[in-house]
């Protein structure tokens, strides 16, 4: 089983993954330690969930027109009513922590107000819900061949169109799913 810390890596759902909630999912791992793992799907836009509308529903005035068009993402099946802001920069917000040198996750409303005004957040994605794994659960799924691992990069995380991210992550590690055996991970 994996002993590596996969924080700031992508999990690429293998085509044979049996859980339909994660079909062709690309998950950014925010935390991976001895207690388990937490990640956010970063390739599933919620077509009916515009960031601006969600902010207005929280009584936050939106003055940045682009925010009205930005799509929120389905972060995962756990707690879909909870928002997580994945963003570049430093953990300077009320409820924020650094994932890597230049990627943070924040759950407090202070960042939402700055996003609404188009002020100083840099790249961001608002994810509703998250994916999580218990102690050693992710290691078992990796050993089972459910996921492939790819180092994270900011272009793929924030700039690549959502519908291209899963394949682009696979391409980045040299995987062609057309030739991938369903027996991956087994000797």
Swiss-Prot record:
Pfam families given in the database record: DUF179 (PF02622)
Leader sequence residues: none
One GO term describing the cellular component: cytosol
Cystines in this chain: none
Gene3D superfamilies reported for this sequence: VC0467-like
HAMAP family found in the cross-reference section: UPF0301
Family to which this protein belongs: Belongs to the UPF0301 (AlgH) family.
Protein name: UPF0301 protein Pcryo_0062
Source organism per UniProt: Psychrobacter cryohalolentis (strain ATCC BAA-1226 / DSM 17306 / VKM B-2378 / K5)
Lineage: Bacteria, Pseudomonadati, Pseudomonadota, Gammaproteobacteria, Moraxellales
């Amino acid at each position: 089983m994996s002993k590596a810390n996969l924080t700031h890596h992508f999990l690429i759902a293998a085509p044979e993954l049996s859980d339909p909630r994660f079909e062709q999912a690309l998950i950014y791992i925010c935390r991976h330690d001895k207690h388990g793992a937490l990640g956010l799907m970063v390739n599933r836009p919620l077509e009916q969930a515009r960031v601006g509308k969600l902010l207005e529903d929280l009584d936050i005035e939106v003055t940045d027109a682009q925010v009205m068009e930005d799509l929120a993402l389905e972060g995962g099946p756990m707690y879909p009513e909870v928002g997580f802001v994945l963003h570049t920069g430093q953990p300077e917000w009320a409820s924020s922590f650094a994932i890597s040198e230049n990627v943070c996750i924040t759950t407090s409303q202070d960042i939402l107000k700055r996003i609404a005004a188009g002020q100083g957040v840099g790249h961001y994605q608002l994810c509703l819900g998250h994916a999580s794994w218990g102690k050693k659960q992710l290691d078992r799924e990796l050993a089972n061949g459910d996921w492939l691992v790819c180092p994270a990069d900011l272009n793929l995380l924030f700039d690549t169109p959502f519908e291209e991210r899963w394949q682009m992550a696979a391409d980045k590690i040299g995987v062609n799913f057309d030739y991938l055996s369903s027996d991956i991970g087994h000797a």
